[in-house]
């Protein structure tokens, strides 16, 4: 069910909810009926002030509820600050999602890798791309998207990866 609330309006509302003392009640409500409610919960998880351990707990509870690319991708974008505060901890945290058989769990893991397209992680990202195998459309498109971002930031390394591979994702 979709209400039709635009993303910029949801972001404004998410910032307001994240500032409230009772934001946890909103995030922990799992009986959402509308796309926008789920999207809003993901945004609040990314925006609310909390320790990294608590945020990862909320992420773990939220990820299984992701059922479309938009919620996944916006949620991952909202986690940018969390990644900056605990880059290696979050790196370890997302590893199990990268081998999940579930389409949107693996997409979550791959889209989270976008935060790691840097000198320190580029080789690991391309190695992961090399072993990636999943039949689901949205997982495959996330991997193709990640490789395109790698190519923009590290064209030589990414081209070396792409040349010997018949990449069809």
Question: What is the predicted function of each stretch?
Answer:
Residues 38, 72-73, 106, 140:
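Residue-level detector of extended alpha-helical repeat arrays and alpha-solenoid scaffolds
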Residues 103-132:
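A mid-sequence, solvent-exposed acidic-amphipathic segment
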């Amino acid at each position: 069910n979709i209400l039709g609330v635009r993303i910029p309006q949801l972001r404004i509302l998410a910032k307001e909810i994240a500032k409230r003392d009772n934001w946890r009640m909103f995030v922990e409500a799992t009986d959402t009926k509308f796309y926008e409610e789920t999207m809003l919960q993901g945004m609040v998880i990314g925006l609310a002030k909390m320790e990294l351990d608590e945020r990862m707990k909320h992420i773990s509870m939220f990820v299984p509820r992701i059922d479309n690319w938009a919620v996944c991708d916006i949620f991952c974008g909202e986690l940018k600050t969390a990644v900056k505060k605990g880059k290696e901890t979050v790196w370890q945290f997302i590893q199990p999602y990268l081998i999940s058989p579930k389409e949107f769990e693996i997409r979550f893991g791959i889209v989270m890798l976008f935060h790691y397209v840097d000198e320190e992680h580029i080789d690991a990202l391309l190695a992961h791309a090399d072993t990636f195998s999943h039949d689901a459309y949205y997982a495959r498109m996330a991997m193709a998207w990640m490789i395109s971002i790698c190519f923009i930031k590290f064209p030589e390394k990414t081209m070396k990866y792409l040349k010997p591979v018949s990449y069809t994702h």
